[in-house]
Amino acid sequence: MSVVVLAAAFLLTAVPIAGALDVDLKVYDEAQRRGETVSIAGRVYTERRKPNAEDVPMAHAVVVALPRSEALVRRLDELRARARDSAPAYREAATEMRRARERYEKQVWESGAPDLVRSTMVDADGRFTLSDLPAGRWIVWATHSEFIDKRSPAYQLRDRERFRLPPRLLGYYAERAWLREVETAPGTSMTLELNDRNVWFSGIVEERVLDAGPGR
């Protein structure tokens, strides 16, 4: 199972942004130079419902490790809390969480440390391993998405023009997310069990389309 270092080539030459991060990335670089590395492994699965049954791997789950940022954790917590306030907030929460994580990843890249953003997809058994991470404090963010078809009828052209209807719903991705904060010591390995019973957040990402012609 390969671990992908998420870094775009053009970012490798980007000018670092002073004061953009609330975490000292030099601590991780120094640990790496001293050879103080760790591994984070685990499984993402649906827990068995009967004692004699087997756990079911969550195929295509993605796991990301990032240097721990208090600002990012606080933002994710805020979005989770806000999702309980209204239906629109709930519908947007998963997307906003992804954007918050991607913004933080970009800051890490632009600070000259693209190798500190690690990502991998689970294997057929739902297992993953993130190896050779500098010892220190990390955020592990895992997600699993499953598309649910909830196709609504196509709009009639006259209705769409008269009422300015929104894009038509095709379905949504039921998204589960796990947030784990871990502190690692040199030469150690850590195992995480991520399953449907200890999900940190459950949300949706809607899939909509703007009808090009009259409904039939």
Question: What is each of the regions a protein language model found here?
Answer:
Residues V4-A14:
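Bacterial N-terminal signal peptides
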Residues I17-R216:
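Long luminal/extracellular ectodomains of secretory-pathway precursor proteins
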